[in-house]
């Protein structure tokens, strides 16, 4: 990875990590992560997971009838789960590709035979409605796929613009909010985000 080393602490060099995740954590967070997890076949585990679901839905601004699926895999595994379980080859998606994670969505659509058109953006450039219109033209789509925050470039896409476009065109809105969750505003209900 990319990083710099700071002074030694207790004989261990401290490094600041500049790679795209996993991210640095403070001692208090690492201590919580080191705690034992309840055995998964107990009611205690079920209670913890139900509380986690309640909190994720609350902090995502999801509708009351929403459910949260926890995936014991990478962010890419979650992206793939959304593509392969929500869309079919009968769908057609618009995918914002402004960096490595947008490109990953395109590759996942290829793997799962989901027809799509990519809105290819120059590195670091914000999405504009004219970009959407230039690709969409008179084509019919069923879904719009975007990384709220394209981690590889640092661009936060204009979710109000995307939401408005999806509402006007009756598109399913699939949003990767992995790197923005709890850091940036994201309200699924207000945006009409489906996944």
Predicted regions and their residues:
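Conserved N-terminal alpha-helix of the aminotransferase class I/II PLP-enzyme fold
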Residues: 33-81, 100, 104-110
């Amino acid at each position: 990875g990319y990083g710099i080393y700071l002074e030694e602490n207790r004989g261990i060099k401290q490094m600041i990590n500049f790679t795209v995740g996993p991210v640095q954590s403070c001692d208090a967070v690492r201590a919580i992560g080191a705690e034992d997890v309840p055995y998964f076949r107990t009611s205690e585990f079920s209670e913890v997971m139900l509380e986690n679901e309640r909190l994720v839905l609350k902090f995502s601004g999801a509708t009351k009838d929403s459910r949260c699926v926890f995936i014991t895999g990478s962010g890419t595994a979650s992206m793939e789960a959304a593509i392969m379980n929500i869309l079919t080859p009968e769908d057609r998606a618009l995918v914002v590709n402004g960096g490595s994670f947008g490109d990953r969505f395109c590759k996942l659509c290829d793997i799962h035979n989901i027809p799509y058109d990519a809105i290819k953006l120059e590195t670091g450039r914000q999405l504009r409605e004219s970009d959407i219109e230039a690709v969409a033209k008179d084509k019919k789509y069923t879904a719009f796929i975007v990384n709220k925050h394209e981690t590889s470039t640092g661009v936060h896409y204009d979710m109000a613009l995307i939401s408005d476009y999806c509402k006007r065109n009756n598109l399913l809105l699939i949003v990767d909010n992995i790197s923005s969750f709890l850091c940036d505003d994201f309200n699924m209900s207000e945006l009409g985000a489906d996944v």
